[in-house]
UniProtKB/Swiss-Prot annotation:
The keyword Aminoacyl-tRNA synthetase does not apply. It comes from the Eukaryota. The keyword Nucleus applies. Keywords: Chloroplast, Nucleus, Plastid, Transit peptide. Responsible for specific up-regulation of the translocon genes TOC33 and TOC75 in leaves. Involved in the general chloroplast protein import pathway regulation, including protein import and protein translation efficiencies. It is found in: Plastid, Chloroplast; Nucleus. Residues 29-49 have a biased composition (Low complexity). It comes from Arabidopsis thaliana. PANTHER family: CCT MOTIF FAMILY PROTEIN, EXPRESSED, PROTEIN CHLOROPLAST IMPORT APPARATUS 2. This is Protein CHLOROPLAST IMPORT APPARATUS 2. Disulfide bonds: none annotated.
Amino acid sequence: MSACLSSGGGGAAAYSFELEKVKSPPPSSSTTTTRATSPSSTISESSNSPLAISTRKPRTQRKRPNQTYNEAATLLSTAYPNIFSSNLSSKQKTHSSSNSHFYGPLLSDNDDASDLLLPYESIEEPDFLFHPTIQTKTEFFSDQKEVNSGGDCYGGEIEKFDFSDEFDAESILDEDIEEGIDSIMGTVVESNSNSGIYESRVPGMINRGGRSSSNRIGKLEQMMMINSWNRSSNGFNFPLGLGLRSALRENDDTKLWKIHTVDFEQISPRIQTVKTETAISTVDEEKSDGKKVVISGEKSNKKKKKKKMTVTTTLITESKSLEDTEETSLKRTGPLLKLDYDGVLEAWSDKTSPFPDEIQGSEAVDVNARLAQIDLFGDSGMREASVLRYKEKRRTRLFSKKIRYQVRKLNADQRPRMKGRFVRRPNESTPSGQR
């Protein structure tokens, strides 16, 4: 298709250009084209070509629910064909054709990039799934080799730690629960008394080869023995330094008698009082026999003798006070409230009787009348004074009201009252002599 344009000036010049119609690709493979729904929505209506200009937003790609799973299955079947079968991938290739260009390098058979997914060559073999896992062991569960040397003050030097291939992981609590805490913590046994090497053994911890395996406490002992300060002359030459050996349990309980015990009689107050009473009785018997009382110390010092005598006297006084308290406690069979009748009589002896003389002589039976005459407030008649004061106040109030009324009445009578045209004065006398 060609077109020609000419300029209208003096020097005629012609410009020509050619337009070629580009055939558009099929609509299934295009991702940026849109179909016009109305003539007003697009500038060019003919077009599914990539050169078409559109104002609408392109549709975003959405995956189907099983598309991600199928892509992962195809990826795994390509990377590991011996483990994952490719049946699912062949069925789903038609469904994932629109998005296959994203995973093209990974799904290609001749691409070298698939080697990146295989870090180990043994994964290609199907026997890899049936190999047992290799158990790594720490150095606290390994066996040790000890070499005795006579020259060292340490006496034993640990050469190396060997990692054993097998470890009995059976439950200690299920097998050795009858042996107590020794089955868990182990027992410390002195293997060589001259070298001072100790071994910590746990019953039941035996390898399949027949050798007793070291437990954690034994490894801790060995690690502490490696310390040069513990082996030096300044150290304490303990298998576990820093007081850790005292935390281990001994072989047996034969040294339990060395533990400090507390006598129960020293704590109990009743037994202590009985002891003091018995001691006092023995002191009295010795005094009656004429013997000297000696508690502790030498007899030669006179000062000590004086101190002893004072101690005995204090013991005697304490015993007497205890006896008195016991007697009083035995006498108090009822309630602990005790009325001091003598003290009450002495307190009221100086005061006069609350009953007046008239009632004292009369032998009336009316108790209420007698109680009415009792002066409860005998201190200068406080209640009577208050009653009199109230009465006077009330009387003066009434008197003042009466006086005020009379004064008002008098003033009203003195004022002239007018009733119509007549004026009457109170001082004016009528002809009849009446007001």
